[in-house]
Design a protein with these regions (language model features):
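Conserved C-terminal beta-signal and adjacent last beta-strands/turns
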Residues: 223, 427, 504-597
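Membrane-embedded beta-barrel scaffold of Gram-negative outer-membrane proteins
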Residues: 273-289, 336-337, 395, 401-403, ...
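Transmembrane beta-barrel wall of Gram-negative outer-membrane proteins
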Residues: 172-201, 206-240, 252-273, 320-325
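Extracytoplasmic beta-strand/coil segments of soluble accessory domains associated
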Residues: 22, 37, 41-44, 69, ...
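Short acidic/polar hinge/loop motifs at secondary-structure boundaries
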Residues: 109-136
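Structural signature of Gram-negative outer-membrane beta-barrels, strongest in the C-terminal barrel
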Residues: 225, 234, 322-326, 345-448, ...
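Gram-negative outer-membrane beta-barrel transporters
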Residues: 363-370, 441, 446-449, 462-535
């Protein structure tokens, strides 16, 4: 009720120096992100049938985020199972789909590990991010192993306007929480470069929850004499962190991830473009876990993992006034080796060759846009899979669209088991409008029918079918008295089968609220709240709304700018966690400064 009253007051109040129609249009188009590529076939948002949310680098700066994990808390339909010390591993869900059902990509390269399909979103620093595209619902017709959706991190490109530009920043918070970053970017003739590096460390806001992470990302770009370009990228994420600590029970992990690519794109003719890339990924991890192995006896387990991916892809795209056709092939050779570091016993030692063929078309017929897509995958370890999808949009007006989408998808939850493939059929109906004066509004109904879900112990594995259906609603207002409001709500009902027993642990209600204030002196304040009803009878505690306050003040000079920022996280010291072992931190404060040149 309070939220409704606030929204009504803001909509009824007179605007402050803004054009209602123009600002509503910007809200609808996403202001610079009107073309989305999360489906692998870039198309206008008004012709995109999938439920996609885009988060830009400006949005990320506003919340003083450290890693991709911090960004997830602010996306409607996404739930973090735990909020911990910056840089430490977290689990998350998308519309109730577990983390091992969601494919996370760095410029189209998967970062999910092979052992259990875990994507370490806390390892990706936000400084390299230009935008993030969240595809909610099966995305297998584009990416293959993406039952619950895809999160595509699109990195920054060289600054085309200057030879040298950059940024340095540092922040400091409680428990010696420190984040230092720098970046350089520019273009000289045909050659462009983007470089960034940083260090994130903390003594731990919770018991045995320390972090010490280093990162580097580099992109070199060369514009070919004709209509094309060549890119080379390398990303290195390295460091250690404490996962949890509860008495004698504790776990620590030390990991390294290196992703390198060489990519090119070339305009063969006016409507035809070819893109190709070579990709290599190397990762290693060492997990140490301590706990009671017998009454009064504390033991230690160690697991060491080495994984690699080597492959490439080639894609052809045809674009004209009537349609956008995309066809391509992916190939990768994957290998994973896991050993018990104490007993020196192999737990996983497997290789596979994976091939995927995909085809997508967006056909524009008047106000309609039809998007049939399909992909065939030969996984090399868990059989072959065909993943079709079909989407349709109908433009009610220039600023309002109706959407429908249905798709089949799958996820490989482990390279270690041949019977590790879980499958889904996703159906969605939605709308998006900017025609209401001063308001952008989006709504989606969804149903995710997932089967062959592995349950039980290794001795007695069973396969279950889960149905999760619900709704998402998002809204944004234009600034009124320099203050704007954003809201998001997600409802999910989970059952075993169509009408079976209630499914515990599915986030039933998720609420996100944000207030943003920006005055003419370049001062900004953001107040964000989030609430998750985990609907779980376990040891969790989630009755509170967690509020974060972010403040920024920018001072402009002739060629540089200085920004001072501060964050108070968990402002009212609330509890919001799924499991008592993974409690969330209490209130903590962080201060920082950023210089752009």
């Amino acid at each position: 009720m309070l939220l409704g009253c606030t929204l009504s007051m803001m909509l009824c109040a007179p605007p402050a120096n803004c054009d209602d129609d123009l600002r509503s249009l910007e809200l609808y188009n996403g202001e610079g992100t009107e073309v989305v590529s999360g489906t692998r076939s870039p198309r206008p948002a008004s012709q995109t049938a999938e439920n996609i949310t885009v988060v830009t680098s400006q949005d990320i700066d506003a919340i003083n985020a450290h890693t991709l994990a911090d960004v997830l808390s602010y996306v409607t339909g996404v739930q973090l199972e735990m909020t911990r010390t910056p840089g430490t591993p977290v689990n998350f869900e998308v519309q109730g789909s577990n983390f091992n059902h969601v494919l996370v990509l760095l410029d189209g390269v998967p970062i999910n590990n092979l052992a259990d399909n875990f994507p370490d979103v806390s390892s990706i620093p936000v400084q390299l991010i230009e935008r993030v595209e969240f595809v909610k619902g099966a995305a297998s017709s584009s990416w293959g192993n993406a039952l619950g959706g895809g999160i595509n991190v699109i990195t920054k490109s060289p600054d085309p306007e200057r030879a040298v530009g950059g940024m340095v920043s540092a922040s400091y918070g409680e428990r010696e929480t420190f984040d230092a970053r720098a970046e350089l970017s520019g273009t000289i003739n045909r050659f462009g470069y983007y470089l960034t590096g940083g260090k994130l460390r903390s003594d731990g806001l919770l018991s045995n929850n320390m972090s010490d992470k280093n990162n580097f990302y580099g992109k070199l770009q060369y514009d070919l004499p004709a209509r094309g370009s060549l890119n080379m990228t390398t990303a290195v994420m390295d460091g250690e962190s404490g996962m949890f600590g509860a008495g004698v029970n504790r776990a620590n992990i030390d990991s390294t991830l290196v992703v390198s690519t060489i990519a090119t794109q070339y305009q063969l003719m006016d409507h035809l473009r070819v893109e190709a890339a070579l990709v290599t990924t190397e990762s290693s991890a060492k997990l140490l876990r301590q706990g009671l192995v017998a009454p009064g006896t504390v033991g230690t387990m160690a697991f060491e993992t080495e994984e690699s991916r080597l492959g490439g892809n080639i894609q052809l795209s045809w674009l004209d006034d009537l349609q956008r056709i995309t066809a391509g092939i992916d190939y990768e050779h994957v290998s994973a080796h896991m050993v018990n570091g104490i007993a020196l016993v192999d737990l996983l030692n497997r290789r596979a060759d994976r091939v995927g063929l995909y085809l997508s078309d967006t056909l524009t017929l008047g106000r309609f846009a039809l998007t049939p897509s399909a992909r065939f995958d030969s996984t090399g370890s868990a059989g072959d899979h065909f993943s079709p999808s079909f989407g349709v949009t109908y433009a009610l007006t220039e600023n309002s669209v109706l959407r429908g989408y249905t798709a089949r998808g799958y996820s490989l939850t482990s390279l270690n088991r041949s019977a590790s493939t879980e499958k889904v059929w996703t159906s969605q109906l939605g709308f998006e409008t900017g025609d209401i004066p001063g308001l952008w509004l989006k709504g989606t109904l969804f149903r995710n029918d997932t089967w062959d879900i592995i349950s039980g112990s290794t001795r007695a594995i069973t396969y279950e079918r889960h149905v999760k259906q619900g709704a998402e609603v998002e809204a944004k207002t234009i600034p009124v008295y320099r203050t704007s409001l954003t809201t998001g709500y997600t409802y999910i009902r989970g059952t075993h089968g169509d009408s079976g027993p209630h499914l515990n642990g599915v986030p039933k209600h998720t609420v996100q609220v944000g207030l943003r204030y920006q005055d003419y002196s370049a001062f900004q304040a953001h107040l964000n709240g989030r609430f998750i009803d985990w609907d779980n009878p376990g040891t969790g505690k989630y009755g509170a709304i967690i509020w974060d306050l972010h403040l920024r003040k920018t001072v402009e000079f002739s060629e540089t700018s200085l920004e001072i920022f501060a964050s108070v996280r968990n402002l009212f010291n609330g509890d919001q966690y799924l499991d008592a072992v993974y409690r969330n931190p209490g209130r903590w404060v962080e201060l920082g400064v950023r210089c752009n040149f």
